[in-house]
C-alpha cells in the first residue's frame, strides 16, 4: 500500500477530488498556504494499493495543469515613512508536487 501526498493549487482541488471520486478513490484534503506569494494550496492525502498508484498519478496529471498568473506579492516589512509600490510578477501556478510513500501499517476503525 502507498500514501500519495500531493500539494496542488486550491483552484484545482475541486476538479481533482471529483475525478478521484469518479474513479473510486477516497481522498482527504487539507487547506495550506505557503511559498513566496503565500497563495492558497490544498494538500491531498490518498491511500491506494501499489498497482493503483499510476492511475492516481494520471488523475493528478489530468487535473493539475500549470499556468501563468500575474500576482502581487505581499509587501515587505517596512520602517515608518518607507514606501512600497507593489509590482505584479509573473508566476507559474498550478501543477502538483507529489510524494508517494510506502505504508507500513493501515487500519480503519
Predicted region positions:
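Positively charged, small/polar-rich N-terminal and surface patches that mediate targeting and assembly
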Residues: 1-109
Amino acid at each position: 500500500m502507498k500514501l500519495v501526498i500531493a500539494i496542488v493549487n486550491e483552484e484545482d482541488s475541486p476538479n481533482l477530488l471529483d475525478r478521484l471520486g469518479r474513479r473510486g478513490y477516497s481522498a482527504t484534503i487539507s487547506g495550506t498556504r505557503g511559498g513566496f506569494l503565500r497563495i492558497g494550496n490544498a494538500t491531498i492525502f490518498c491511500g491506494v494499493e501499489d498497482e493503483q498508484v499510476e492511475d492516481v498519478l494520471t488523475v493528478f496529471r489530468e487535473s493539475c495543469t500549470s499556468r501563468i498568473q500575474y500576482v502581487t506579492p505581499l509587501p515587505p516589512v517596512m520602517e515608518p515613512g518607507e514606501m512600497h509600490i507593489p509590482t505584479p510578477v509573473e508566476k507559474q501556478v498550478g501543477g502538483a508536487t507529489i510524494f508517494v510513500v510506502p505504508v507500513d501499517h493501515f487500519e480503519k476503525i
